[in-house]
């Protein structure tokens, strides 16, 4: 248990120390690269903005991810249960996923002019539903027939079989995908925040640091984003432990 | 006594990319209530297909499957199934795995009653004390025991098993045969067991049905004329030995091997064992070229097979 906390903390401390050393050794001024010791001032000065920005980034990411989960599950179920749907949808999905999402920012902005919150949530959703849909689809379509037959032979409905067997059985794959999706959704949110003029959230704070040539602020935002990203990721890990903890094998 | 399972004239083909694949053709089977029917046959001949037809998971192209006198058109709650893969749900405890069918069949049964029923069975198969364990914490043999409990928890009238002990080592398998025998003595159910182990079929079966190679038809039916309370030792008895030889020869025929059997039926089947032989498939073969489908057995059917029919 101590190891579990001590090792990451030590790694973090080492990373910060190396960073500080690098900046100090090269004598970089803070408009080239800020050093960790510059950051506390930025946080102190802009703490209120950091809090509101983090909140905006957070809720829009989570909203986008929630949409991605709903839509991804639905799509995954359709692809998992119908071969035809799978054959038809798969190329479409892969093609869509291959589109660089940055190109969607102006498209969304023109489609829904001025709806900044909506656009941000949409982007978080669009960028993150793919892994969920694919993993649920594969999980369901590879369910061994015996698993279905133990309930089907009792006359259970398709929905009962899905609820009692197929869904819980695909939870480990689902959470694996959700870990990827949460990071993607986060990137999607930030992308829109940074690219949009008059944006909100941590991304907008980054942009204002840039326009004001406040480099320590920019770095402080990057660190805040990293922290938020880690928090989101581990929130998913915690959910996974609760809902799919059974899939973890005791390590020998 | 009525036949709890009655299958007649069943034909079935799978539709595959390379065209229809006939799997069953001329399958006859009748199992009286409370009896144990073991089914053996070459691998890939259609045994699992047979279990799916009995369970109502599929409908045959032709012919009919009757369960408790009524034609099977869809799954029934009076059926229990077990497979080679125990298919336990890893996110449930052993107890909750066993209870699963009750959640479907008796959704209003109080939890305490379900637990009591599950514990009764777990106790019978020697899993008392393992209720709270996860499936991955159990050995293969124990998982298969739990799977049997789940198949029986809702008191089905028919238990259908598809090579349930096939993946176990020999000694574990023999333990499970005895568990199966004890379960039958306590609970009343009719049983269809698919197996590729002839010793298993003779130890557990009241009758052993040999299926021909694909497309499978009923090639041979052996009535196992051994006492009910069998022990493993009985397999080393001469009567059991004779039956095993005879089944081995039948399997060879089913596989369509042309090499002559090592034994001819006549010197291996003295009175007692031969008395119980009935062979509808062979009888039809013996009926001459009157439209019986060509099976590999026709060419090589030895005396033993037709003789049983003649009696
Ligand atoms: N769903 C299916 N579609 C097409 N072919 C199948 C299907 N299920 C089984 N088969 C084929 O039918 C034959 C009989 O299968 P099966 O009943 O599983 O045989 P057994 O259990 O005796 O080994 C095999 O050749 C198998 O490949
Ligand atoms: Mg099989």
Briefly describe each language-model feature range:
Chain B
Residues 1-4, 13-26:
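A short, flexible loop at the N-terminus of ABC-type nucleotide-binding domains that lies
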Residues 40-42:
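The feature captures the beta-strand-to-loop junction immediately N-terminal to the Walker
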Residues 55:
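Helix-to-loop junction immediately C-terminal to a conserved catalytic motif
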Residues 63-75:
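Conserved ABC transporter NBD signature motif
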Residues 95-105, 115, 119, 223:
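Short helical segment in ABC ATPase nucleotide-binding domains corresponding to the A-loop/adjacent helical element
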Residues 106, 111-130, 182:
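Conserved ABC ATPase "signature" region
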Residues 133-136, 154:
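Conserved signature/switch motifs of ABC ATPase nucleotide-binding domains
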Residues 159-162:
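Catalytic Walker B motif of ABC-type/P-loop ATPase nucleotide-binding domains
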């Amino acid at each position: 248990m101590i190891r579990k906390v001590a090792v990451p903390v030590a790694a973090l401390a080492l990373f910060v120390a190396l960073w500080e050393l690098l900046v100090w050794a090269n004598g970089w001024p803070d408009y080239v690269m800020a050093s960790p010791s510059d950051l506390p001032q930025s946080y102190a000065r802009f703490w209120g903005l950091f809090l509101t920005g983090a909140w905006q980034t957070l809720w829009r990411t989570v909203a986008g991810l929630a949409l991605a989960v709903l839509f991804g599950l639905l799509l995954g179920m359709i692809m998992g249960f119908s071969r035809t749907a799978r054959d038809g949808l798969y190329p479409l999905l892969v093609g869509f996923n291959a589109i660089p999402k940055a190109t969607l920012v102006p498209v969304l902005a023109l489609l829904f002019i001025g709806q900044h919150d909506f656009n941000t949530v949409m982007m978080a959703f669009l960028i993150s539903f793919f892994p969920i849909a694919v993993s649920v689809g594969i999980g369901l379509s590879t369910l061994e027939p015996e698993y279905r037959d133990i309930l089907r032979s009792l006359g259970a409905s398709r929905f009962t079989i899905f609820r009692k067997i197929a869904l819980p059985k695909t939870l480990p794959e689902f959470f694996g995908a959700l870990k990827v999706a949460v990071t993607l959704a986060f990137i999607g949110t930030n992308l829109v925040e940074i690219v949009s003029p008059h944006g909100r959230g941590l991304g907008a704070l980054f942009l204002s640091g840039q326009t004001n040539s406040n480099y320590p602020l920019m770095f402080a935002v990057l660190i805040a984003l990293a922290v938020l990203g880690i928090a989101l990721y581990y929130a998913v890990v915690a959910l996974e432990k609760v809902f799919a903890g059974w899939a973890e094998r005791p390590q020998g | 006594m009525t036949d709890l399972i009655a299958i007649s004239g069943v034909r079935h083909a799978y539709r595959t990319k390379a065209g229809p694949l006939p799997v069953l053709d001329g399958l006859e089977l009748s199992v009286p209530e409370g009896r144990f029917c073991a089914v053996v046959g070459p691998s890939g001949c259609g045994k699992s297909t047979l279990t799916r037809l009995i369970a109502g998971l599929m409908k045959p192209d032709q012919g009919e499957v009757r369960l408790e006198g009524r034609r099977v058109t869809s799954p029934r709650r009076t059926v229990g199934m077990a497979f080679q893969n125990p298919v336990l749900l890893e996110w449930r405890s052993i107890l909750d795995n066993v209870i699963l069918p009750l959640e479907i069949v008796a959704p209003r049964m109080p939890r305490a009653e379900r637990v009591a029923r599950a514990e009764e069975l777990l106790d019978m198969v020697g899993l008392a004390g393992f209720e709270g364990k996860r499936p991955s914490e159990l050995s293969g043999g124990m998982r298969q025991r739990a799977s049997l409990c789940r198949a029986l928890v809702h008191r089905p009238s028919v238990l259908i098993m598809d090579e349930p002990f096939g993946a176990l080592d020999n000694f574990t398998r023999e333990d499970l045969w005895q568990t199966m025998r004890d379960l039958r003595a306590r609970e009343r159910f009719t049983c269809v067991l698919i197996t590729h182990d002839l010793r298993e079929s003779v130890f557990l079966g009241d009758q052993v049905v040999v299926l021909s190679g694909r497309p499978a038809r009923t090639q041979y039916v052996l009535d196992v004329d051994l006492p009910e309370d069998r022990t493993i030792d009985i397999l080393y008895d001469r009567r059991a030995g004779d039956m095993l030889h005879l089944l081995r020869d039948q399997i060879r025929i089913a596989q369509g091997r042309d090499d002559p059997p090592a034994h001819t039926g006549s010197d291996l089947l003295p009175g007692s064992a031969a008395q119980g032989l009935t062979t509808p498939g062979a009888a039809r073969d013996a009926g001459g070229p009157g439209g019986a489908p060509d099976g590999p057995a026709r060419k090589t059917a030895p005396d033993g097979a037709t003789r049983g029919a003649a009696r």
